[in-house]
């Protein structure tokens, strides 16, 4: 079975149930959530996440595994502000606890961190320090380090940087990788013409068994732009053919694929989610040039 879905919202009273219902409405077989707002530290208690009802709905609809995304305010790469680093460590610990409580997520996707001017080596050492403070040998969820585009002072823009972080961490069996197609393309890897070559390179440097999550996004920018701006499937510089190849790649069949493509529409208050139609299009093997209009008409 193709494990494909998108980022969905966990909110209101229904929480996990709402997320599962949204995913099922898109024809998804997996999904990704934040356990609270990604831009702040306010979190509902675990008891209010409506886990049991959510899991029951997932089971009824054949969804076995979901992904959690850590909030992007976490920066364990910060060497200049001890309070930012400490917030990242404490918050990541809490996210591991919350994700474990869900019982259906094995991976927490984490942007490795930004060195904020101290240089990549210093940032990487700080990320290692943070992960060593957080990870325990008996935890049941992995931290999936996301491949980054190289915007600003981001660490993790190359497979070598990801490998360096993993190598420095004591309990690194608790680390995996989230391969983001837009980020990897924007970082300079040629996933359009030579994805198999890129995957082989990843295998040599990091190890393909570490690749446990895929973020499937097209890119608004040319390869190597270092920008990180997602585009709808087939409407960017990566293109439908390459993304379809990645989604159906025989070596990655078991890996959950998560769409983080933009909502569609000119009116900011009335943008439509693209995921149902993008998932259908990735399943059926044919690019639909009229897709954006169909999404708007939903």
Curated annotation (Swiss-Prot):
Zn(2+) 1 binds at residues 69, 111, 146. GO terms for molecular function: deoxyribonuclease IV (phage-T4-induced) activity; DNA binding; DNA-(apurinic or apyrimidinic site) endonuclease activity; phosphoric diester hydrolase activity; zinc ion binding. InterPro entries: AP_endonuc_2 (IPR001719), AP_endonuc_F2_Zn_BS (IPR018246), Xyl_isomerase-like_sf (IPR036237), Xyl_isomerase-like_TIM-brl (IPR013022). Its cofactor is Zn(2+). It catalyses: Endonucleolytic cleavage to 5'-phosphooligonucleotide end-products. The keyword Zinc applies. Binds 3 Zn(2+) ions. GO terms for biological process: base-excision repair. It comes from the Bacteria. Keywords: DNA damage, DNA repair, Endonuclease, Hydrolase, Metal-binding, Nuclease, Zinc. Zn(2+) 3 binds at residues 183, 228, 230. It is an enzyme of class 3 (hydrolase). Zn(2+) 2 binds at residues 146, 180, 215, 260. Its EC number is 3.1.21.2. Endonuclease IV plays a role in DNA repair. It cleaves phosphodiester bonds at apurinic or apyrimidinic (AP) sites, generating a 3'-hydroxyl group and a 5'-terminal sugar phosphate. Belongs to the AP endonuclease 2 family. PANTHER family: APURINIC-APYRIMIDINIC ENDONUCLEASE, ENDONUCLEASE IV ENDODEOXYRIBONUCLEASE IV. HAMAP family: Nfo. NCBIfam families: nfo, PRK01060.1-1. This is Probable endonuclease 4. It comes from Bacillus cereus (strain AH187).
